[in-house]
Each structure stands twice: as C-alpha cells, then as structure tokens.
C-alpha cells in the first residue's frame, strides 16, 4: 500500500456523506478533475443528494448512488447536461475506496451519479473519471454498505441504504454559488395546507343527544339579532334599521363638526391673547403695527424670550462671581436695547467678522461679548458653553505662529557653535579650580566646549614596551630543536661507544 500513497497526488477538499450505515469521509482531487469535483461539491451544497438511495450495490465491486429518482437512469449535472471525462495518469482503480463518476456506458456521458469501489478494479481505468477517495475508518462503513441484501438486478432490498445528508467541510472552489432548485409538484402540494374544517358534533351517539340538539338550536336563535316590527313589516310608514343608522351617523358627524369648530375658536382666542401679551411686554399698545420693520420685531421677540426665561428662573449660569455680579448690568443693558433699535443691528457686520477672526483677548472680553450679544443669551447652558469654547479655540489658533517662531529661535540658539568670541576653545579639566559664583557670567555657558585630558593606559597605542622583549613561541621551531637534540645525543653516544677501540 505504500506505493499507492506515493503515486497518488495530494488532495484538496473534504466532504462527509452521512448514510444510514454511518458517515463516509471523502477527499477530493480538484486539480486533476476540476469539472467532476465542481459538479459534485455544488450538488452537495444544494442538497441534491439528500434522502436519495443507493440504487445499485454489487458485493465486492461497487456501491452506486446520486440518482434522485432512484431508478438508475435519472440525475443531471450543474452544467445542464452531460460533461466530458477527465483522466489522469496518477489516478487509477488500484485499491478500494475510490470515488468515480458513473456514465451511460459511453464516453463523455457524466451526470450526477457516482460510485464507491469495494476492491481493486483495474479494468475501469481510462473509462470512468476518478475525483476522490474514502479515507480513515469510514472505509468500514462503506464495506458494510456493500454487504446489504440485493435482488437479481443488483438492486438493494427494502429498506435500501440512503444518503441522509452531505456536509462540505472543505470547499476547494470558493466561487461556487448554490442554485435555488425548483420544488417538485409533490413537495409543493404537501406544503399547501387545506383550510381547517369545523368538526361536526355527532349528538346521535349520546343517550341524551336529542336534548343537546334542542339546546344548540335555542342558542343559535339567541345569537341572532332581535328584529323589531319596523324591520319585519313592509310598511312605508315605519322606519327601518338602516334609516335609523343613517340618522345616527348624521348626528355623530354634526357632533364632530361642532367639536372641531369649538377647538378652532379656542385656538384663535389663544392666538389673540398671545399677540396682546406680546404687544404689552414690548410696550407698543398702538394698533398701527403694520409699519413695523423686521429688525424691531426681532428685538421684541428676543426681549420677550429673555423676560419669559427670567420669570421661569432659567437664567444663564455664570462660571465666576464676577459674572454673577455683572448680571444686573446685563439686564439693564437688555432693557435699554428693548426701548430703542438694537445696537447690535446698527453695528456693521464687518466689525463683528474682524473680531471673530482676531479672536478675543481674554476671558473678560469673552464675558463682555456674552453680555452684549443677545443671540448668545438665548442659548441654553450647554449650547452657550459650546459657543464660548469655539471662541477660545479660535483665539488659541492665532498664537500658533508665534509659538512656532519662538521654538525655531530656541533651536537655532542651541545649535550654535560652542566657541567664544576669540574662537579659542575653553578647556575644562577635572582638576580646575571652581570660579566664584558671584563673578561668573552665565551668558557664556553655551560657548564652552567640554574637554578632558587623556588618561594613560586607556589608549592601547600609547604603550612604551619594547617589541624585542616579547617572547615568540614557534611550535615548528620547538619540534626542530627536539629533533636536533636527539641527533646530538645519538652522536655523542656513538662517540662514547667507539672511544678507545681500534678499527683493526
């Protein structure tokens, strides 16, 4: 079996086929058989194989399914018809658990049916498209499927094994979009619910059925509306129920109209009272208000709102005691503005814009603007705080240029060359005596260059050792000396042996 795993290409994609005999894990080869794998995976996602039977089982050979009709001749692919075979040189029917497409005993006739092999099937090579294999212990569930009882035409006997559902754990094609399949006529008919029929009481089965039936009739008569002689007799002098209903509706409509008229009259009276109160608070009781211009009307409305807020007690909150003390002055100024034309309207708009662009110099000016501007007083507490925050923010925005200029000047002073006016560096050593602090000029501290005298011993090149005093160790020289010494000892020994002896 080791040669099988070496020759077969790696898989990509996994599907679990849940059957009545247990789950079957199927791994796919989308690179080697892209059309077949795409067809199989999309049909699984659409639930095409759910509750379909294995219509053909041959023990020791194969288990075939994928036909929704269960006849062995049905089934359709996602391409709208049959599609071509896909053969690969490294995919063969060399062992059990191979998953391949079933065809109509002719090439390029693949649909939706597929089969699992139960053993080695060499004679099917190059005839059926292989697109997957069964992995893990689920191969034993497949073998149990192959052991079911079958008839003479290889059809499993009842109950036939089924595909309950299919789960796609790893989809090799991310662009697959499941289709919305049309429902069959049987399913649509089952979904149409019949209207519930009212059950009929079978009173004849009871011993007291006749009495119960009479009671039912009496109740039915009581439920009916009681009719008067006006409705029963056909007399034109008598009014029918319809006529009385019409009169009742007419009277109701009249009541509604009268109520509406009363409400409208109340609204008009309230508006008149309101207009009189406005004229009283402003102080203009004359009837010739038509010639009043829009500016005066705006001033009147502002003063009216301010007076109403004073009566309610909703005065603008002051952040400091200074603002509280100046609240009386603000009220006096507001009353003076109400007598004459608003000074706010007489000021040119360009002056106000220049004030906004320049920003307000201090919080005192901001307080002055708050008292002077009647529009700001009309705001509530939160809105007024937000407007003041905007003014302060606008004031701070004008100081950015000056702050940046000061920062740049400081950088230039720091980066100046640390030399004195005589362009001679001042050397400070650790042994220098301290100078009197009273006579020291602190303005020249940036012109000082800190420099220390070099310490001996730290500079490796300042040693005074004699290079000839170093001892040189040469291993080869030492080895040669040893050899020379041995030769000298041997020569001396030889001389001692031949000493005192003649050559004759």
UniProtKB/Swiss-Prot annotation:
Compositionally biased region (Polar residues): 416-434
Disruption phenotype: Increased susceptibility to P.syringae infection.
MF annotations from Gene Ontology: peptidyl-prolyl cis-trans isomerase activity
InterPro entries in alphabetical order: Cyclophilin-like_dom_sf, Cyclophilin-type_PPIase_CS, Cyclophilin-type_PPIase_dom, Cyclophilin_A-like
Enzyme class: isomerase
Bias kind Basic and acidic residues: ranges: 237-275, 344-354, 364-374, 494-504
Location relative to the cell: Nucleus; Cytoplasm
Gene (UniProt): CYP57
Coiled-coil features, chain-numbered ranges: 204-274
Protein's UniProt name: Peptidyl-prolyl cis-trans isomerase CYP57
Keyword Chaperone: yes
Pfam families registered for this protein in UniProt: Pro_isomerase (PF00160)
EC number(s) on file: 5.2.1.8
Top-level taxon in the UniProt lineage: Eukaryota
